[in-house]
């Protein structure tokens, strides 16, 4: 966890993360909650977490949360939505690793038979992350003005998604 905390506390990394600038202890608590959700899944939500390594060094982390697709009147459904997240050490930016990570996440999410849709939320200013998603044919479905507050300032966000049938299409670059 030390390696994850090290890069996630760097301004060039945390400026693109929903938690903004956190102290090391706060990041550890956040990750412990994720681990707890991973080891104690509920019918409402479960989570999968990975670290990204290169040559024996942790260079990122990623994962996804799984929830049930919404239905009219909250009727039961087996259909699931995976919401992916990823963060990489800024030292490896621009090397294609983000694309590899997202491709692996989507592959893993769609290996679960009931996952119908994969989504990603990205700050509107994070052009590199948007480019990674678009390279894998995610569709930008929404632009949300003043969607959240990070370090006291409003931020805009974009929602991207990809459906199973699009990922499995013969012409997809997966």
Set out the residue ranges of the language-model regions.
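GNAT-family acyltransferases
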Residues: 1-91, 108, 112, 147, ...
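Alpha-helical hinge/cap motifs
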Residues: 85, 94-96, 142
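Short amphipathic helical patch at the helix-1/turn junction of helix-turn-helix
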Residues: 88, 123-124
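Conserved acetyl-CoA-binding loop-helix of GNAT-fold acetyltransferases
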Residues: 94-111, 127-135
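Conserved GNAT acetyl-CoA-binding A-motif
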Residues: 111-121
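Short, Lys/Arg-enriched C-terminal cap helix and immediately downstream tail that follows
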Residues: 117, 145-146
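Conserved acetyl-CoA-binding loop of GNAT-fold acetyltransferases
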Residues: 134-144
């Amino acid at each position: 966890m030390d390696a994850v905390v090290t890069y996630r506390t760097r301004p060039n990394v945390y400026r693109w993360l929903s938690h903004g600038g956190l102290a090391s202890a706060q990041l550890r608590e956040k990750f412990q909650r994720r681990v707890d959700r991973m080891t104690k899944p509920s019918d409402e939500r479960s989570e999968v977490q990975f670290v990204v390594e290169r040559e024996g060094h942790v260079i990122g982390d990623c994962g996804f949360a799984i929830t049930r697709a919404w239905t009219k009147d909250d009727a039961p459904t087996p259909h699931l939505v995976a919401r992916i997240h990823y963060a990489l050490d800024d030292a490896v930016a621009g090397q294609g690793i983000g694309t590899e990570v997202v491709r692996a996440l989507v592959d893993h999410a769609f290996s679960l038979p009931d996952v119908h849709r994969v989504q990603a939320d990205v700050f509107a200013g994070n052009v590199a992350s948007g480019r990674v998603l678009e390279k894998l044919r995610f569709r930008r479905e929404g632009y949300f003005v003043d969607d959240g507050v990070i370090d006291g300032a409003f931020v805009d966000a974009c929602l991207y998604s990809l459906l199973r049938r699009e990922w499995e299409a013969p012409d997809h670059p997966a």
